[in-house]
Amino acid sequence: MRCPFCHNDDTQVLDTRVSDEGDTIRRRRRCAKCDKRFTTYERVELVLPAIVKKNGSRVEYSHDKLASSLKLALRKRPVSSDSVDESIARIEEKLLSLGEKEIPSERVGELVMRELKRLDKVAYIRFASVYRSFADIESFESALKELK
Protein backbone atom coordinates (compact mmCIF):
# COMPACT_ATOMS: atom_id res chain seq x y z
CA MET A 1 0.00 0.00 0.00
CA ARG A 2 1.42 3.38 -0.97
CA CYS A 3 1.87 5.97 1.79
CA PRO A 4 -0.51 8.93 1.24
CA PHE A 5 2.08 11.34 2.69
CA CYS A 6 5.39 10.50 0.97
CA HIS A 7 4.12 8.02 -1.67
CA ASN A 8 6.56 5.33 -0.56
CA ASP A 9 5.45 1.78 -1.44
CA ASP A 10 6.92 0.20 1.70
CA THR A 11 4.34 0.21 4.53
CA GLN A 12 3.69 -2.09 7.48
CA VAL A 13 0.34 -3.27 8.82
CA LEU A 14 0.22 -2.56 12.56
CA ASP A 15 -3.33 -3.65 13.33
CA THR A 16 -6.17 -5.37 11.47
CA ARG A 17 -9.82 -5.44 12.56
CA VAL A 18 -13.01 -6.68 10.97
CA SER A 19 -16.07 -4.40 11.21
CA ASP A 20 -19.05 -5.43 13.33
CA GLU A 21 -21.01 -6.19 10.14
CA GLY A 22 -18.16 -8.37 8.88
CA ASP A 23 -18.02 -6.71 5.47
CA THR A 24 -15.10 -4.33 5.99
CA ILE A 25 -11.52 -4.77 7.14
CA ARG A 26 -9.80 -1.82 8.83
CA ARG A 27 -6.01 -1.79 8.73
CA ARG A 28 -3.74 0.59 10.65
CA ARG A 29 -0.51 1.09 8.70
CA ARG A 30 2.87 2.80 9.16
CA CYS A 31 5.15 4.06 6.42
CA ALA A 32 8.70 2.65 6.57
CA LYS A 33 10.14 5.86 5.10
CA CYS A 34 8.39 8.81 6.81
CA ASP A 35 7.08 6.83 9.84
CA LYS A 36 3.59 8.38 9.55
CA ARG A 37 0.52 6.29 10.30
CA PHE A 38 -2.67 5.99 8.30
CA THR A 39 -5.76 3.81 8.10
CA THR A 40 -7.08 1.86 5.12
CA TYR A 41 -10.39 0.06 4.63
CA GLU A 42 -11.01 -2.97 2.45
CA ARG A 43 -14.42 -3.93 1.10
CA VAL A 44 -15.56 -6.41 -1.51
CA GLU A 45 -16.65 -4.65 -4.67
CA LEU A 46 -19.84 -6.27 -5.90
CA VAL A 47 -20.49 -5.60 -9.56
CA LEU A 48 -23.71 -6.76 -11.13
CA PRO A 49 -23.33 -8.38 -14.55
CA ALA A 50 -23.90 -6.56 -17.82
CA ILE A 51 -27.17 -7.42 -19.54
CA VAL A 52 -27.10 -8.97 -23.01
CA LYS A 53 -30.28 -7.93 -24.79
CA LYS A 54 -32.16 -10.06 -27.32
CA ASN A 55 -30.57 -8.15 -30.22
CA GLY A 56 -27.08 -8.95 -28.87
CA SER A 57 -26.29 -5.47 -27.56
CA ARG A 58 -24.91 -5.09 -24.05
CA VAL A 59 -26.10 -2.60 -21.46
CA GLU A 60 -25.05 -1.88 -17.91
CA TYR A 61 -27.31 -3.38 -15.25
CA SER A 62 -29.81 -0.81 -13.98
CA HIS A 63 -31.35 -1.12 -10.52
CA ASP A 64 -33.81 1.64 -11.47
CA LYS A 65 -34.99 -0.20 -14.58
CA LEU A 66 -35.60 -3.37 -12.60
CA ALA A 67 -37.48 -1.43 -9.92
CA SER A 68 -39.64 0.42 -12.45
CA SER A 69 -40.50 -2.83 -14.26
CA LEU A 70 -41.64 -4.47 -11.05
CA LYS A 71 -43.54 -1.40 -9.90
CA LEU A 72 -45.29 -1.07 -13.26
CA ALA A 73 -46.48 -4.69 -13.11
CA LEU A 74 -47.57 -4.20 -9.48
CA ARG A 75 -49.28 -0.84 -10.08
CA LYS A 76 -52.55 -0.59 -8.12
CA ARG A 77 -52.00 -4.03 -6.61
CA PRO A 78 -52.06 -4.69 -2.84
CA VAL A 79 -48.31 -5.25 -2.45
CA SER A 80 -46.20 -3.20 -0.04
CA SER A 81 -43.16 -1.26 -1.21
CA ASP A 82 -41.10 -3.24 1.34
CA SER A 83 -42.10 -6.46 -0.42
CA VAL A 84 -41.07 -4.97 -3.76
CA ASP A 85 -37.71 -3.87 -2.32
CA GLU A 86 -37.14 -7.36 -0.88
CA SER A 87 -37.91 -8.92 -4.27
CA ILE A 88 -35.47 -6.57 -6.00
CA ALA A 89 -32.81 -7.48 -3.42
CA ARG A 90 -33.43 -11.22 -4.02
CA ILE A 91 -33.11 -10.77 -7.78
CA GLU A 92 -29.88 -8.79 -7.40
CA GLU A 93 -28.47 -11.34 -4.94
CA LYS A 94 -29.21 -14.10 -7.43
CA LEU A 95 -27.52 -12.14 -10.23
CA LEU A 96 -24.44 -11.63 -8.05
CA SER A 97 -24.35 -15.27 -6.95
CA LEU A 98 -24.15 -16.40 -10.58
CA GLY A 99 -20.67 -14.87 -10.73
CA GLU A 100 -21.05 -14.00 -14.41
CA LYS A 101 -19.80 -10.84 -16.12
CA GLU A 102 -22.72 -10.92 -18.56
CA ILE A 103 -26.18 -12.39 -18.34
CA PRO A 104 -28.94 -12.64 -20.97
CA SER A 105 -31.93 -10.36 -20.45
CA GLU A 106 -34.12 -13.47 -20.67
CA ARG A 107 -32.56 -14.77 -17.44
CA VAL A 108 -33.34 -11.50 -15.66
CA GLY A 109 -36.90 -11.67 -17.01
CA GLU A 110 -37.32 -15.19 -15.63
CA LEU A 111 -36.08 -14.07 -12.20
CA VAL A 112 -38.56 -11.18 -12.27
CA MET A 113 -41.39 -13.52 -13.24
CA ARG A 114 -40.51 -15.89 -10.40
CA GLU A 115 -40.68 -13.02 -7.90
CA LEU A 116 -43.92 -11.66 -9.34
CA LYS A 117 -45.51 -15.11 -9.24
CA ARG A 118 -44.69 -15.21 -5.54
CA LEU A 119 -45.88 -11.64 -4.88
CA ASP A 120 -49.02 -11.23 -6.95
CA LYS A 121 -50.53 -13.44 -9.67
CA VAL A 122 -52.17 -10.52 -11.53
CA ALA A 123 -48.85 -8.66 -11.68
CA TYR A 124 -47.23 -11.87 -12.93
CA ILE A 125 -49.71 -12.07 -15.84
CA ARG A 126 -49.26 -8.37 -16.60
CA PHE A 127 -45.48 -8.74 -16.79
CA ALA A 128 -45.63 -12.05 -18.68
CA SER A 129 -47.96 -10.56 -21.31
CA VAL A 130 -45.34 -7.97 -22.22
CA TYR A 131 -42.22 -10.06 -21.56
CA ARG A 132 -43.47 -13.03 -23.58
CA SER A 133 -45.24 -10.82 -26.17
CA PHE A 134 -48.69 -12.36 -25.83
CA ALA A 135 -50.43 -11.99 -29.20
CA ASP A 136 -53.78 -13.61 -28.49
CA ILE A 137 -56.13 -14.82 -25.79
CA GLU A 138 -54.66 -18.35 -25.97
CA SER A 139 -51.34 -16.97 -24.74
CA PHE A 140 -53.08 -15.53 -21.68
CA GLU A 141 -54.94 -18.81 -21.09
CA SER A 142 -51.69 -20.75 -21.26
CA ALA A 143 -50.05 -18.43 -18.72
CA LEU A 144 -53.07 -18.70 -16.43
CA LYS A 145 -52.85 -22.51 -16.56
CA GLU A 146 -49.21 -22.25 -15.43
CA LEU A 147 -50.39 -20.46 -12.29
CA LYS A 148 -52.79 -23.24 -11.28
UniProtKB/Swiss-Prot annotation:
Q: Which InterPro entries match?
A: ATP-cone_dom, NrdR-like_N, RNR_NrdR-like
* Gene Ontology molecular function: any one: ATP binding
GO biological process, alphabetically ordered: negative regulation of DNA-templated transcription
ATP-cone domain boundaries: 49-139
Q: Where are the zinc fingers (unnamed)?
A: 3-34
Origin: domain of life: Bacteria
Cofactor(s) needed: Zn(2+)
Q: Pfam families attached here?
A: ATP-cone, Zn_ribbon_NrdR
Indicate the secretion signal residues.
none
Coiled-coil segments on the chain, per record: none
Q: How is the cofactor bound?
A: Binds 1 zinc ion.
Which UniProt keyword terms apply here? ATP-binding, DNA-binding, Metal-binding, Nucleotide-binding, Repressor, Transcription, Transcription regulation, Zinc, Zinc-finger
Q: What does this protein do?
A: Negatively regulates transcription of bacterial ribonucleotide reductase nrd genes and operons by binding to NrdR-boxes.
Stated family: Belongs to the NrdR family.
Q: Which NCBIfam families match?
A: transcriptional regulator NrdR (TIGR00244)
* Name recorded for this polypeptide: Transcriptional repressor NrdR
- Say which species the protein is native to: Polynucleobacter asymbioticus (strain DSM 18221 / CIP 109841 / QLW-P1DMWA-1)
This protein's gene is called: nrdR
